[in-house]
Amino acid sequence: MKTNYEIRYAAHPEDAKHYDTARIRRDFLIEKVFSDNEVNIVYSMYDRMVVGGARPVGEVLKLEAIEPLKAPYFLTRREMGIYNVGGPGVVKAGDAVFELDYKEALYLGSGDRVVTFESKDASNPAKFYFNSLTAHRNYPDRKVTKADAVVAEMGSLEGSNHRNINKMLVNQVLPTCQLQMGMTELAPGSVWNTMPAHVHSRRMEAYFYFEIPEEHAICHFMGEVDETRHVWMKGDQAVLSPEWSIHSAAATHNYTFIWGMGGENLDYGDQDFSLITDLK
């Protein structure tokens, strides 16, 4: 196995509005979340969020404590949320064993233990997408499925944004230090998410898009309300959203995305909305 990591530094909105396409993609887009028998990690300076992915194909992959953590174990001072977006898989955390099927999630609290990822079938490998944030205390590990989620049905087919927001790793379901994660599923014929747009300066966010055919693409919108930019994305890619940025998208096909947040509070509803007609 191999662990790859990179550090992404934070940007001031006054600087970011001058970025060209290549710079925007380099600083905010995470193109390769999954590689066979590798753990790919992006360590972001936005609230020190870690975004990563692991795809074990006939090997057991270990979550290593990358050098920037300066810790004996990855979870020594961190909590983590994991989603399986591939074939059936297994996550082991110390002596605990968790089987995760497609779209099932797992919360791991902080503590000194080895974490590993493996697939049940190498011909149908699991794909583990994860977010991690710093933690001031330990909370119990817990597997969470859509049956456990707080579900909000939003939008309409007429508005091209009919979707279910599955709030899964949130404080209405289980205790966390600052991590919140969920999964939004767009209905066939719907392509817009998070519109009207909003920001939450108390929290940064990361989006991971999947369940979109290879010949289609997602146009993710970011930036300040009066200085928006776009990032064209494919399935199985992620994007960082600074606390000052909107985060929305439209696509050429319906899709699903996993959102993860961290920062000042655990209030999902703490959002500052903008009128659609104010976007520039």
Please state what every model-predicted region is.
Residues 1-66, 70-71, 75, 79-80, ...:
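Hydrophobic, proline/glycine-rich low-complexity stretches
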